[in-house]
């Protein structure tokens, strides 16, 4: 997942220092959200691995439901902030107008991917906790190479596509995040039989596990 952002940084380097600085600084803000969701997912994986070993299917689903709700709320919050205040975000890191302008364009497009990325990160940790490390691996590899391909097309205007520069890098990342989300989340919710989590399980009563989840996850988020 981090490789997607890294690919953006590398591929916009040929556009000049302003473009490279804009993408690198914008990704610093996105990384705050990314590491938060990774921490939530890791906290969830501590609990899901235990419940998986205990064969406690209900508690396993409750933990995933809690993680889903928190990631959705956090994702919506970051989406709104990134979409509505990209210029303020960029000014936190730099005062150069040319860099800020390109960073705003990048963040505007990338804001749409926040919710998708958060859920993908969290569910990937859940998969690993129940012994399925291959699915997140395939998802990350696919998203990485899809992002490189889309970046090449949209940054440099190949195969008849418009030359979008920094905005093209953000568009490539958005497409990669959509792929990652469909690969990880849609499979878990609609096709997976190992965990058996479905959309209606998101609304399960989970008060009995909420305190434990917070106690485990918050320290992980802070340390990340």
Regions found by a protein language model. Name each.
Residues 48-115, 161-218:
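Short alpha-helical transmembrane segments in multi-pass integral membrane proteins
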Residues 82, 125, 151, 155, ...:
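Structural signal for membrane-spanning alpha-helices in multi-pass inner-membrane proteins
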Residues 6, 20-83, 117-131, 135-136:
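Small-residue-rich hydrophobic transmembrane alpha-helices
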Residues 3-21, 90-97, 153-164, 221:
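Helix-terminus/linker motif at the lipid-water interface of multi-pass membrane proteins
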């Amino acid at each position: 997942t981090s490789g997607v952002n890294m690919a953006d940084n590398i591929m916009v380097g040929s556009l000049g220092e302003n473009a490279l600085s804009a993408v690198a600084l914008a990704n610093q803000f996105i990384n705050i959200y990314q590491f938060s969701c990774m921490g939530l997912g890791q906290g969830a994986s501590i609990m899901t691995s235990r419940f998986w070993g205990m064969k406690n299917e209900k508690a396993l689903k409750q933990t995933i439901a809690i993680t889903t709700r928190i990631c959705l709320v956090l994702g919506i919050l970051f989406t709104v902030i990134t979409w509505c205040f990209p210029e303020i975000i960029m000014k936190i890191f730099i005062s150069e107008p040319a860099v800020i302008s390109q960073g705003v364009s990048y963040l505007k497009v990338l804001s749409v991917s926040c919710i998708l990325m958060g859920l993908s990160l969290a569910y990937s940790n859940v998969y690993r906790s129940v012994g399925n490390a291959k699915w997140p691996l395939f998802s990350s590899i696919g998203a990485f190479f899809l992002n490189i391909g889309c970046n090449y097309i949209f940054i440099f205007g190949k195969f008849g596509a418009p030359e979008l520069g920094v905005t093209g890098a953000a568009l490539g990342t958005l497409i990669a995040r959509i792929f990652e989300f469909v690969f990880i989340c849609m499979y878990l919710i609609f096709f997976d039989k190992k965990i058996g989590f479905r959309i209606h399980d998101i609304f399960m009563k989970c008060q009995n596990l909420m305190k434990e989840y917070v106690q485990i996850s918050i320290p992980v988020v802070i340390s990340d």
